[in-house]
Amino acid sequence: MHERIRKILVLLPCFLIVSVTCGQSSKTQTASFPLDSVAGLELVNAKVEAISYRGRTAIHLGPLPGRENSDEAAIAILKGSDFKDGTIEVEVAGAPRAGAAPDLRGFIGILFRVQSRGAQAEDFYLRPTNGRSDDQLRRNHSVQYESAPDFPWNRLRKESPGVYESYVDLDPGAWTTMKIEVSGTKARLYINRAEQPCLIVNDLKLGDSHGQIAVWAHATTEAYFSNLTIK
């Protein structure tokens, strides 16, 4: 199946900009990754270029020549990130590459609490072409949670139909804001700055863990990322 992908790591040692804002009794630290340059990137089985896409500076993540139709993914890990609880927000734009098979959806998403170079990770991702489909069942599968290594999307769908995926309006190729709030074993996914989450997970499969943060896309996706922040 196309979504049972072999995730290929692409290391992204991005420039880290840290700002601190003070509240009445606590401090909130924000780490910003502009994702606007290829400088300092270590690439594995992928290519990355810095471009301007739909009015934003961004990185374009894609497969190596000859791998455009493979059932693989490129993952970009944010070097130096160590995340347990908090908020991750990033701008993404994804759509199937021209000529991709009709059952491909433009898979694109965020990994968090990443360990062992992606062997373990929590994952929220989008299926952009499902968001405005005329097929209601496809619309219900617009966003997805999964967890590596033991809980891929198809196992979760079989064992708990409708629990780990949901509908949200998505426009393929358009900039989309993904925000994930994580606390302990719970996580919430928000799209395009909505006040309410489109997907709630109350039992993250890796438990109350920690690890790195990454962005990823399927080899058949035209994928763009910009302005990632961690709070």
Feature annotation, model-predicted:
Residues 24-231:
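Extracellular glycan-recognition regions
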Residues 10-19:
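Bacterial N-terminal signal peptides
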